């Protein structure tokens, strides 16, 4: 069963031998700045065969070396939100996020998130500070959201509906876009209004 009816898909990691990991490269890699803190969160649960285990959460550089590390514990067959803070030990241009259970079993993960603590106006899950500040410095009289192809989609079933972009992140209805990738809608109407 999914975490929410609007969000029916989640990752299943069947660990038969310790060492298996779920990794995400981000969009062209995750940029890390030495000394900065990054908030990790995800929803996780055990499948029926699971016994529970610590999960090592780490950020890896291009060579696979750990540059930040924390751990969370998956111990329930119900969805639970897990959180950790990772501190980058060095600058990395194209890091990847890795989730590695310390025990065998089947793990379910959803809404895996990594955000810098240094966001525009310090908002949790906020906008990238440098980009948002550059836009704010222009003092625009209006901003369009959603814009372009996101607004009209590729048909009636894919038109942007603002109601799917508000509320708890895990309850927001994901949307595929014309560029061929998936949007969680973590940046929805509420976040855009906050920015404005």
Description of each model-found segment:
Residues 1-187:
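Extracellular and organelle-lumenal recognition/adhesion modules and their flexible linkers in secreted
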Residues 189-196:
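A structural motif corresponding to the C-terminal end of an alpha-helix
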């Amino acid at each position: 069963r999914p975490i929410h009816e609007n969000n029916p898909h989640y990752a299943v990691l069947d660990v038969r031998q310790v060492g298996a990991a779920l990794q995400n490269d981000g969009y062209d890699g995750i940029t890390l700045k030495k000394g900065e803190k990054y908030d990790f969160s995800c929803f996780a649960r055990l499948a029926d065969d699971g016994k529970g285990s610590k999960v090592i959460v780490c950020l890896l550089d291009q060579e696979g070396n750990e540059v930040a590390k924390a751990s969370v514990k998956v111990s329930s067959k119900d969805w639970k939100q897990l959180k950790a803070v990772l501190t980058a030990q060095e600058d990395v241009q194209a890091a990847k996020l890795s989730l590695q259970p310390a025990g065998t079993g089947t793990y379910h993960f959803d809404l895996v998130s990594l955000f810098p603590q240094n966001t525009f106006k310090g908002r949790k899950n906020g906008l990238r500070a440098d980009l948002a500040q550059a836009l704010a410095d222009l003092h625009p009289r209006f901003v369009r959201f959603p814009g372009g192809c996101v607004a009209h989609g590729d048909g009636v079933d894919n038109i942007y509906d603002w109601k799917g972009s508000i509320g708890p992140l895990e309850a927001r209805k994901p949307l595929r876009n014309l560029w061929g990738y998936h949007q969680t809608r973590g940046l929805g109407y509420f976040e855009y209004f906050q920015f404005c």
